[in-house]
Amino acid sequence: MASATATTSAADLAAVKVVLLDIEGTVCPISFVKDVLFPYALQALPVTLDKKWDSPDFAPYRNAFPEPAASSRPVFEAHVADLVKRDVKVSYLKALQGYLWLAGYESGDIKAPLFPDVSPSMRAWHDAGIKLIIYSSGSVPAQKLLFGHTNASPPSLIPIISDWFDTVNAGMKMESSSYTSILSRYPDTQPQEWLFLSDNVDEVSAARAAGMHSLVVVRPGNAPLPECHVGEGQAVQTFEGLAVGGKRNESSKSS
């Protein structure tokens, strides 16, 4: 079991076969989720409930909410607004948000603003045989919407992503058991052959405790890092030049 503040060396990166990626604050700005996605869902909710409150296709999302919210539209709306305001990460809210974002992505109103280094690096790693997997507190359907509608060219990165994990099929991201659960799905790959990239130091520590290599990703708008997570082998500001599997991508500026 690795230390929560263990460093990741160039040799460690060269041995990596799987990159596990967080989303918010790692591949796209935190502000996209808080300032674009969350408000969009709240704005779309009343119109959606006008049309869908009693419809069979909306029933799974509505019935996933606890009572009395599931039976009362005013309570439902108030509960959603409260959860969003407090940034509570519960699976039934995440599923509803993904449902509400679908129309926005499909209409082109929403495009995920990936950092410039993300798409070129992910494609370079994929071309080098590195498996790419997503792990986010957002639901798997919402993850696929985001990576299917980005500002990159081509806009969809779904074809190069091998698997998707959220708090439902893996567990909470700050618990080492969640990373152990993900590892168990890939018994032919050793923990030390995984690299988890996230802006959250507690998630990074949990992944390291499960035996993965992990780096804190420092992006504009992210919270300042604790001193123990600052330094070479602890944090990165860009995926560019990160020689995962011995493959270094330095093309993001020209892509």
From Swiss-Prot:
GO molecular function: acireductone synthase activity; magnesium ion binding
Binding site for Mg(2+): D22, E24, D199
Locations listed in the record: Cytoplasm; Nucleus
Main location per the UniProt record: cytoplasm
Cofactor: Mg(2+)
Pathway field: Amino-acid biosynthesis; L-methionine biosynthesis via salvage pathway; L-methionine from S-methyl-5-thio-alpha-D-ribose 1-phosphate: step 3/6; Amino-acid biosynthesis; L-methionine biosynthesis via salvage pathway; L-methionine from S-methyl-5-thio-alpha-D-ribose 1-phosphate: step 4/6
UniProt enzyme class: hydrolase
Record-listed E.C. numbers: 3.1.3.77
Keywords associated with the record: Amino-acid biosynthesis, Cytoplasm, Hydrolase, Magnesium, Metal-binding, Methionine biosynthesis, Nucleus
GO cellular component: cytoplasm; nucleus
Positions bound to substrate: S136, S137, K173
Catalytic activity: 5-methylsulfanyl-2,3-dioxopentyl phosphate + H2O = 1,2-dihydroxy-5-(methylsulfanyl)pent-1-en-3-one + phosphate
Cofactor binding remark: Binds 1 Mg(2+) ion per subunit.
InterPro entries referenced in this protein's UniProt entry, alphabetically: Enolase-ppase_E1, ENOPH1_eukaryotes, HAD-like_sf, HAD_sf
GO biological process: L-methionine salvage from methylthioadenosine
Function: Bifunctional enzyme that catalyzes the enolization of 2,3-diketo-5-methylthiopentyl-1-phosphate (DK-MTP-1-P) into the intermediate 2-hydroxy-3-keto-5-methylthiopentenyl-1-phosphate (HK-MTPenyl-1-P), which is then dephosphorylated to form the acireductone 1,2-dihydroxy-3-keto-5-methylthiopentene (DHK-MTPene).
Quaternary structure note: Monomer.
Family label: Belongs to the HAD-like hydrolase superfamily. MasA/MtnC family.
PANTHER family assigned to the protein according to its UniProt record, in alphabetical order: ENOLASE-PHOSPHATASE E1
Protein known as: Enolase-phosphatase E1
Organism (species): Verticillium alfalfae (strain VaMs.102 / ATCC MYA-4576 / FGSC 10136)
Lineage of the organism: Eukaryota, Fungi, Dikarya, Ascomycota, Pezizomycotina
